[in-house]
Design a protein with these regions (language model features):
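Alpha-helical segment of the N-proximal tetratricopeptide repeat
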Residues: 23-47, 54
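Register position in tetratricopeptide repeats
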Residues: 37-38, 71, 110
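Helix-start (N-cap) detector for alpha-helical repeat units in TPR-like alpha-solenoids
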Residues: 24-25, 59-60, 93
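TPR/TPR-like alpha-solenoid helical repeat scaffolds
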Residues: 93-115
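Bacterial signal peptide processing site
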Residues: 11-15
Length: 115
């Protein structure tokens, strides 16, 4: 069931992304999931790590990486990203994309069920 929710989230990636000029113009948050090949998740994770390095203060970057980590079976790391992203949301929820908030709430509940 969780896998279905996660894969559904991949198809529904229509959330908006702010493009601040001060943050790397070369790497956008959307790069994490661009050209995703489920047979090359290690390569996707490497790209996603670069996105998080550039945009680690944005919950969307951590949400995307948590999805990849979950697909790779690295649930503890995925839940750590979810926890960090939720903390960022609590700091500034006014500017958060509602889709990101929803995704993180679903993943957070899933992580809590494992404990």
């Amino acid at each position: 069931m969780i896998g279905g929710l996660l894969l559904t989230g991949l198809g529904c990636r229509s959330r908006s992304e702010p493009k601040p000029a001060a943050i790397s113009a070369e790497i956008s948050i959307a790069d994490c999931m661009s050209d995703l090949d489920l047979n090359k998740l290690d390569k996707a994770l490497q790209r996603c790590n670069e996105v998080v390095d550039a945009h680690g203060d944005k919950p969307a970057a951590l949400a995307d990486r948590s999805l990849l980590l979950t697909l790779m079976g690295k649930t503890d790391q995925a839940c750590a990203d979810v926890t960090q992203a939720m903390a960022l949301l609590r700091q500034d929820s006014r500017t958060a994309d509602p889709m990101v908030v929803h995704e993180l709430n679903v993943r957070h509940k899933s992580c809590k069920q494992r404990d």
